[in-house]
Design a protein with these regions (language model features):
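Basic, Lys/Arg-enriched alpha-helical interface segments
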Residues: 1-68, 77-81, 90-116
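Conserved catalytic cores of phosphodiester-cleaving nucleases, focusing on short active-site segments
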Residues: 84
Length: 116
């Protein structure tokens, strides 16, 4: 099992929790189920649930009807996955701004906590 960590900004915002709090019940349930799959499978989780993006950033995917949630994350030493940010996606490509935000949060996490 992998430990799932929700990234918090220095001002104590939790972007993934904010996303989860905004989701409708069915989409929330599917998103939480996908996070559970990540917890159970770690880096072995593959499409359609998880996809590598770039710079060791990965994307979790959950779909309910026409809505698709994406939660970006990275792995750290000790069987841990850090969920950085997420959004509801309407297009095929992950927005560059979301990938850049995930990279920024990853760098911030590593600066504050190292690779623990």
């Amino acid at each position: 099992m992998y430990e799932i960590i929700l990234y918090d900004t220095e001002d104590e915002r939790c972007p993934v929790q904010e996303l989860l709090d905004s989701l409708e019940p069915k989409l929330l349930a599917k998103t939480l189920r996908t996070i559970d799959l990540l917890e159970m499978n770690g880096p072995l989780l593959r499409e359609p649930y998880s996809k590598p993006l770039e710079n060791w950033i990965f994307e979790l995917r959950a779909k309910q009807g026409s809505d698709i949630t994406r939660v970006l994350y990275f792995f750290i030493v000790g069987k841990k996955a850090v969920l950085t940010n997420g959004f509801i996606k309407k297009s095929q490509k992950t927005p560059k701004a979301e990938k850049e935000l995930a990279k920024k949060y990853k760098a911030d996490y590593e600066r504050r906590y190292g690779n623990e």
